[in-house]
Amino acid sequence: MDREEISRFSAELMNMLIQGSIGLSTIQGIELGFFDWIPHNKPITAQELAVQLGYDLGKVERWLRFAAVYGYISRSDGGYTLTTKGMLLRRGTPTPDLLGLHHMFSYFTKAIQHSKDAYLKGVGLDSITHGTISRDYIPRVASQLSKASVAFFQRAGLSTGHTILDLGCGDGSVLREIAKTLPGISATGVDMNIHTLELGKRKNIEMGLQDQIDLQAGDVTNMSRFPENAFDWVYAFNVFHFLPVNKREKFIREMLRISRYGIFFNQVIANSVQTLSVDVLLATLFTDYTGFFSETEADEIIRRVSAQHYAFMPVIQGESRLVSIYTVTHDLPLTRVADLPVDQRNLLQAKDIRTAKGLLTASPSLLTEIGLDSETVRKPVIRALFP
């Protein structure tokens, strides 16, 4: 073996392990509750933290030393406070998808411990543990990863008074976010996991949303009970990698059939070493996992169902893209959108954007390039197209 290659690859592999240990120590802090218990505005000592949580003082001090060096906490007045960086990993974080990813990796560590059983038996850890993983994973991981999509729905056209169906809703966390953001929404969720549905129903009651959100048990691949245009919007997040590849196109077409205005779904694309590694670990976790899209498959399925617009999600950019397909049958020339200022319309027409759908499917970067705020210019079009 070449000595230079040995040296280079050894350094690379060592760095990978070091980064892995940082991630594991961070996940340990989340699991132990440190990020939730350390205040951001009032110092707490290691002794106080150990007593409050019932933990060994020496181990708490070791974790605090790590957290201080990595920037999660800062030392002041004889104690520790949480930094902005650390606050992103506590409950109520403004970036729930980030917290969800950390929880996801905590499950991956469990999957690794049972790799031999999963590989020999051809099943996932969820089967080996009789469904325990699935029950816990959805509220802690999947629900957190889904919340970031609510802003995209609004940008695409979802408004107060509309109806929406969430296929593979888990505990309904996304629907609760939608209901909080847009009062008056009528929401329905369908999922096969009875445990998470019951958890979601309890949360709906706690928040007074039980009359606004209807959670139903059912097979998300069977939409025959819903008539055409049954809902204004239909949505599926992190569902496709649990569907057989040969059923994915039909699933999208059924979503299109039962939607009045449009559909949303995401495609996780195995286009990097990160997603390829996650693909391996999810297959170890779940028996019914069928895999991410290749880039070619993702593009081809959108082409076959005539998707008009797609956009990338903010956190896992380039690896998970959220797609919107408009099913509303009519369109409007921009000249008939009453609240759209003439000067803005002229700028759009100069870029050959002449209809409401044309504006909604235009690249946000293009709108910025011609001096228009994407959110502002879309609002009158959304009101006109989706009453």
Residue ranges and their predicted role:
Residues 270-288:
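Short, glycine-/aromatic-enriched active-site segment of Class I SAM-dependent methyltransferases
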Residues 330-387:
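Compact, charge-rich alpha-helical regulatory domains located at protein termini
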Residues 66-162:
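Conserved Class I S-adenosyl-L-methionine-dependent methyltransferase catalytic core
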Residues 1-110:
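N-terminal accessory segments
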Residues 193-195:
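Conserved SAM/SAH-binding beta-strand->alpha-helix loop
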Residues 260-268:
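Conserved beta-strand signature within the Rossmann-like core of class I S-adenosyl-L-methionine
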Residues 249-261:
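A short glycine-rich, Lys/Arg-flanked "PGG" loop and its adjoining helix->strand segment in the class I
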Residues 235:
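A conserved beta-strand element that flanks and buttresses the S-adenosyl-L-methionine
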